[in-house]
Amino acid sequence: MSEILKRQRLSERIADNLRHYPIVAVLGARQVGKTHIARTFATSESHRFDLEDTATAAALSENPNSILGALKGVVVIDEVQELPKLFPTLRVLADREDAPAKFVISGSVSPNMIRGIGESLAGRVATLEIGGFDLTEAGVKNWQQLWLRGTHPPSFLADTDSDSIGR
């Protein structure tokens, strides 16, 4: 069953929040699908930034305004907790009068992330926490698998019950 489940309700919540806020933060534990769902909102491949990539992080660290400020549409920044000094730049970009870009930022809940959101992005960001699958996402027909394997996506989506152990 190693397919990706669509998280329709979560996608709808992100889309709705993008209509009302310039920034949507998608937070959660490792491997719950933050990156996968956030990337679906990027206007194009050039609007996706993964801050675990050292070259990307270095470029955004040196000149975030020139890189992000020129973009229009929805920009996705993954693992944003890796570059906390980006939060003030996001605040400036979110406050632009014409607001040509909206941002979906994702990352693991960390002190840097919480501090950055609380100090720099207050009033500009909607925060959504992602957890494991729920019954509506897994499907009622899979209730036993959800009960046996748990809600953590890698475990639930493993090919076999034995493969799901320890994931």
PLM features: residue spans?
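Phosphate-binding site recognition
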Residues: 1-167
